[in-house]
């Protein structure tokens, strides 16, 4: 992978000049000039997904110049490097191969000269056998009862991905009840334990090292709770499994290492739902549906790795994002799924994007002088319309939005879905084209009112429009289409990281707070006044000690 400062490229300089020409051009102007704009600026994937990027402040020239930037930064070479197992995560000296986890073609993928696929397939087979025993009821708890509830204990990538997918695919779930515990706040585990029965609950402890503070604190609390009912420590093995590589610690916890599901250091946490970390997904929707999820992602992997950049959906979305972030000064992107099952999708890619590309040091070790990762946020529609869309429509910030919706709903109640989709279509139209003063005044006339007498309120009803959006319409949210959609965003993030010359697959920003917390924890054990920190931190700790009694 080449380490190129994008702002020093000829393409970036050309884009800067082009931006000066484009900054006052409106989306309405672009549609007025080209009646065929939709067909030129949209594409379908596998007859499962339509991506419409026509309501953006771009022209064919814009895209051509952005493609030049991708070429000059050697995006094609970087894609080959990742897919071939090169150690592109250089700060940790690791390959980045979540694509191997869903490599349904089973073609060899080498790391240090060794094909990883036999081990990947062996873990998948183990997940299949284990999940079938749990789902069928063949696996019995310590009193001979079948499992009814599964509690996944993890944090970050060991929680966000499985939770998002199991929620998104609830229409495919079986009889097992899924629960997720992540926060070290005891409230989280306490509230989940109130809902489950020790005789019929399986706990999945998801920690590669089996040392993650939050996860192991929750796991030990779950174990203590379980043993209060079960008594004998030998019963732990019937009710706990591990997603880990630390066999010694897993065994000491009381888990049978035969029920330890491993993954590898080339699997990053926020890209790990495709691995053993996805065992909760398998238990929720069954192994065959999990394979469909992998297959959808694999299909997008093939599209990303083989399709020319001009037609490559992850690349197009990535380039458009860079255009707004670095030239228009957009600081955030909203992800707005019009599907209630997808209510954790934005939160999942909040981690996926911000932990990946929230970096201010480039691959050469230099502080950057341009924008890297955007702030990602969002909520399901139509809820967001009654919360924060006001700012998107009439605020002073530019907020590029991705609208996502299925054409076919899993719950065809009355005309609910038509009403939902009418809002989905209306919002992108409203954001793009707005409403002029003339239209507002005409609306008053149509109501028999004189606009002149209402002049004071007219400006507040004007919408400038020119707010950019992408629309992603899925045929239906299935395991396959969801897998493809997740991979679309993963590769968008990778593409942006390549071009912005940052290391996308490490996360050193997580470490400092953890180190300081480990230093502070012993100071909270007694009632002594603290003076070892700055005055603010000392003051906070000492007030905490005074109030806790």
UniProtKB/Swiss-Prot annotation:
Query: Would the keyword rRNA-binding be found if you checked this record's keyword annotation?
Result: no
Give the keywords, sorted.
Answer: Acetylation, Cytoplasm, Gluconeogenesis, Glycolysis, Isomerase
Q: Which Pfam families match?
A: PGI
Kindly give the SUPFAM superfamilies that the UniProt entry links to this protein: SIS domain
Which coarse location class describes where this protein primarily resides? cytoplasm
Catalytic reaction list = alpha-D-glucose 6-phosphate = beta-D-fructose 6-phosphate
E.C. code: 5.3.1.9
The record's listing under CDD domains reads: SIS_PGI_1 (cd05015), SIS_PGI_2 (cd05016)
Compartments reported by the entry? Cytoplasm
* Positions of post-translational N6-acetyllysine modification: 80, 228, 234
Q: Which HAMAP family match?
A: G6P_isomerase (MF_00473)
Query: What is the protein name for this chain?
Result: Glucose-6-phosphate isomerase
């Amino acid at each position: 992978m080449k380490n190129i400062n994008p702002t020093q490229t000829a393409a970036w300089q050309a884009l800067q000049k082009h931006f000066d020409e484009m900054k006052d051009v409106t989306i309405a102007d672009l549609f007025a000039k080209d009646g065929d704009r939709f067909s030129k600026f949209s594409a379908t994937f596998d007859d499962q997904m339509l991506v419409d990027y026509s309501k953006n402040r771009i022209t064919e020239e814009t895209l051509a110049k952005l493609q030049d930037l991708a070429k000059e930064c050697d995006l094609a070479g970087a894609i080959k490097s990742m897919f071939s197992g090169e150690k592109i995560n250089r700060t940790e000296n690791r390959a980045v191969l979540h694509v191997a986890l869903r490599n349904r073609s089973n073609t060899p993928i080498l790391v240090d000269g060794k094909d990883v696929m036999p081990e990947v397939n062996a873990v998948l087979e183990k997940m299949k056998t284990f999940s079938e025993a749990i789902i069928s009821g063949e696996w019995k708890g310590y009193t001979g009862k079948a499992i009814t509830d599964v509690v996944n204990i993890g944090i970050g990538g060991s929680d966000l991905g499985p939770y998002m997918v199991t929620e998104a695919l609830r229409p495919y779930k079986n009889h097992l009840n899924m629960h997720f515990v992540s926060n070290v706040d005891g409230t989280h585990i306490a509230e989940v334990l109130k809902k489950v029965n020790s005789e019929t609950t399986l706990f999945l402890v998801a920690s590669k090292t089996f040392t993650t503070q939050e996860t192991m604190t929750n796991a030990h609390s779950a174990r203590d709770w379980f043993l209060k009912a079960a008594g004998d420590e030998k019963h732990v093995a019937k009710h706990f499994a591990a997603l880990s590589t630390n066999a010694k610690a897993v065994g000491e916890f009381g888990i049978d290492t035969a029920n330890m599901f491993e993954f590898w250091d080339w699997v990053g946490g926020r890209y790990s739902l495709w691995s053993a970390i996805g065992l909760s997904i398998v238990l929720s929707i069954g192994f065959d549906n999990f394979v469909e999820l992998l297959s959808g992602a694999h299909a997008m992997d093939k599209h990303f790795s083989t399709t020319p950049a001009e037609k490559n959906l992850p690349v197009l979305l990535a380039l458009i994002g860079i255009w707004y972030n670095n030239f228009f000064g957009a600081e955030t992107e909203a992800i707005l799924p019009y599907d209630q099952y997808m209510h954790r999708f934005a939160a999942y890619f909040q981690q996926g994007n911000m932990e990946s590309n929230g970096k201010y040091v480039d691959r050469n070790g230099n502080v950057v002088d341009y924008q890297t990762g955007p702030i990602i946020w969002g909520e399901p529609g139509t809820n967001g319309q009654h919360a924060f869309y006001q700012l998107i429509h009439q605020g002073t910030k530019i907020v590029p939005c991705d609208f996502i919706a299925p054409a076919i709903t899993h719950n065809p109640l009355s005309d609910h879905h038509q009403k939902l989709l009418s809002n989905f279509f209306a919002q992108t139209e409203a954001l793009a084209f707005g409403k002029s003063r003339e239209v507002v005044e005409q609306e008053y006339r149509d109501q028999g009112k004189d606009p002149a007498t209402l002049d004071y309120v007219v400006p507040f009803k004007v919408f400038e429009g020119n707010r950019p959006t992408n629309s992603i319409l899925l045929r239906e949210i299935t395991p396959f289409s969801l897998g493809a959609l997740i991979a679309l965003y993963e590769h968008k993030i990778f593409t942006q990281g390549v071009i912005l010359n940052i290391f996308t697959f490490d996360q050193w920003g997580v470490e400092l707070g953890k180190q300081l917390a480990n230093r502070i924890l012993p100071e909270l054990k007694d009632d002594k006044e603290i003076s070892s920190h700055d005055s603010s931190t000392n003051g906070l700790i000492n007030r905490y000690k005074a109030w806790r009694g």
